[in-house]
């Protein structure tokens, strides 16, 4: 029913933002990634929307990119994955990282989402993997050779390890761009930590 909303950003809550348009304040559920991109209160924003209607609930879900919206909708096609679980996955991982985790079958990465167990992670991989394009195997921002699956796995593990150690995904990605991706996982992590600690 709705394609997008453009209006004044009013504020943020635990799992939603408020956008005012024509005197009406819209409660829009969203991911941590989109929340982190919110401007100052009173500034204009635009979110791409998906409306979910159930017997006892009508909700708007919004994202700052069409790519994130499409990934949200794709996750909802998986049995056992509802809006909360989908938002959780999009909050702990950028869209491209989530895509390539699914493509290489990285259940550990997917299980980081709240309410996502091993069985659900396996279903997500099974039901979505073939729907993703081969060139989406790798997060393009990490500039990995898509032909070398071992490098992809190593970088995925290194990225997850750095995040687990408390570094932000942005910090981890930034330093991993400069590391030799043909090295072992252990050495990639060691070299990344050296770079991060100066």
UniProtKB/Swiss-Prot annotation:
Residue ranges, annotated region (Flexible linker): 144-149
Localization of this protein: Cytoplasm
Function: The RuvA-RuvB-RuvC complex processes Holliday junction (HJ) DNA during genetic recombination and DNA repair, while the RuvA-RuvB complex plays an important role in the rescue of blocked DNA replication forks via replication fork reversal (RFR). RuvA specifically binds to HJ cruciform DNA, conferring on it an open structure. The RuvB hexamer acts as an ATP-dependent pump, pulling dsDNA into and through the RuvAB complex. HJ branch migration allows RuvC to scan DNA until it finds its consensus sequence, where it cleaves and resolves the cruciform DNA.
Keywords linked to the UniProt accession: Cytoplasm, DNA damage, DNA recombination, DNA repair, DNA-binding
Annotated source species: Clostridium beijerinckii (strain ATCC 51743 / NCIMB 8052) (Clostridium acetobutylicum)
Residue segments, region Domain I: 1-64
Region Domain III: start-end pairs: 150-198
CDD domains, per database record: UBA_RuvA_C (cd14332)
Any one GO biological process: DNA repair
Molecular function GO labels: ATP binding; four-way junction DNA binding; four-way junction helicase activity
UniProt-recorded name of the protein: Holliday junction branch migration complex subunit RuvA
The keyword Cell membrane is annotated on this UniProt entry: no
Region of interest called Domain II, as start-end residue ranges on this chain: 65-143
Entry annotated with the keyword 4Fe-4S: no
Quaternary assembly: Homotetramer. Forms an RuvA(8)-RuvB(12)-Holliday junction (HJ) complex. HJ DNA is sandwiched between 2 RuvA tetramers; dsDNA enters through RuvA and exits via RuvB. An RuvB hexamer assembles on each DNA strand where it exits the tetramer. Each RuvB hexamer is contacted by two RuvA subunits (via domain III) on 2 adjacent RuvB subunits; this complex drives branch migration. In the full resolvosome a probable DNA-RuvA(4)-RuvB(12)-RuvC(2) complex forms which resolves the HJ.
Main location: cytoplasm
Record Pfam families: HHH_5, RuvA_C, RuvA_N
InterPro entries for this protein: DNA_helicase_Holl-junc_RuvA_I, NA-bd_OB-fold, RuvA, RuvA_2-like, RuvA_C, RuvA_C_sf
Assigned protein family: Belongs to the RuvA family.
GO-annotated cellular components: cytoplasm; Holliday junction helicase complex; Holliday junction resolvase complex
């Amino acid at each position: 029913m709705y394609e997008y909303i453009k209006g004044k950003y009013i504020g943020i809550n635990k799992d939603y933002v408020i956008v005012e348009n024509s005197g009406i304040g819209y409660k829009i559920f969203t991911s941590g990634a989109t929340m982190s991109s919110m401007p100052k209160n009173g500034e204009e924003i635009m979110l791409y929307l998906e409306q979910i209607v159930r017997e006892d609930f009508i909700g708007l879900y919004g994202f700052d990119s069409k790519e994130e919206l499409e990934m949200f909708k794709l996750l909802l096609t998986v049995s056992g994955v509802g809006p909360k679980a989908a938002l959780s996955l999009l909050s702990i991982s950028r869209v491209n990282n989530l895509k390539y985790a699914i493509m290489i079958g990285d259940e550990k990465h997917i299980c980081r989402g709240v309410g996502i167990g091993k069985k659900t992670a396996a279903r997500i991989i099974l039901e979505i993997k073939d729907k993703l394009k081969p060139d989406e195997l790798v997060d393009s921002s990490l500039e990995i050779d898509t032909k070398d699956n071992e490098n992809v796995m190593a970088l995925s593990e290194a990225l997850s390890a750095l995040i687990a150690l408390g570094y932000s995904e942005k910090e981890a990605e930034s330093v991993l761009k400069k590391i030799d991706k043909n090295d072992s996982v252990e050495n990639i992590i060691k070299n990344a930590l050296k770079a991060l600690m100066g």
